[in-house]
A protein has these predicted regions:
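Positively charged, small/polar-rich N-terminal and surface patches that mediate targeting and assembly
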Residues: 1-149
Length: 149
């Protein structure tokens, strides 16, 4: 499904300058994506308002409701798919700047700091970030100019 068909997309910003192994990149991106969604649910105390249903094809569909019992924007993301778009920056400073721009807009940003146990010579290192699932028109002003990873 092309990215333009999705109702929401989740941006992952990786630090390319770290030259992480492919498995490390996948793990760090996974941590960031999951944490950003959980943070978005917790922000409005929604963790208790999440339920699992199944569509006509037997596939799982997560339902998140708002204060009025209506599906929230996150439900559209779960129902119609959330495109994962991975872009990159080449420094910690650039990563932290993107994180701050997102926070300044009121977006949930999961900034991942690896403990350094398997890479980075034992030093804790910021590796990536992920935003909560957002509409393109909301996130593109911040990340639209970044190159795809």
């Amino acid at each position: 499904m092309p990215v333009s068909s999705y109702k929401a997309k989740q941006l992952i910003v990786m630090r390319r300058d770290l030259k992480m192994r492919k498995g490390k990149i996948a793990a760090q991106a996974g941590h960031a994506c999951v944490e950003a969604v959980l943070m978005a649910l917790a922000r409005e105390d929604r963790l208790s308002d999440v339920s699992l249903s199944y569509n006509e094809d037997g596939e799982p569909v997560w339902i998140v409701v708002d204060d009025h019992g209506d599906p929230s924007p996150l439900t559209d993301g779960f129902r119609y798919g959330v495109a994962k778009v991975c872009v990159y920056v080449d420094s910690e400073e650039a990563l932290l700047d993107i994180a701050q721009q997102g926070r300044d807009q009121g977006f949930i940003v999961s900034l991942i700091r690896d403990a350094g146990l398997t890479e980075f010579h034992g030093e804790a290192t910021y590796t990536c970030l992920a935003f909560e699932p957002l509409r393109a028109e909301d996130i593109d002003p911040i990340t639209g100019g970044l190159p795809l990873y």
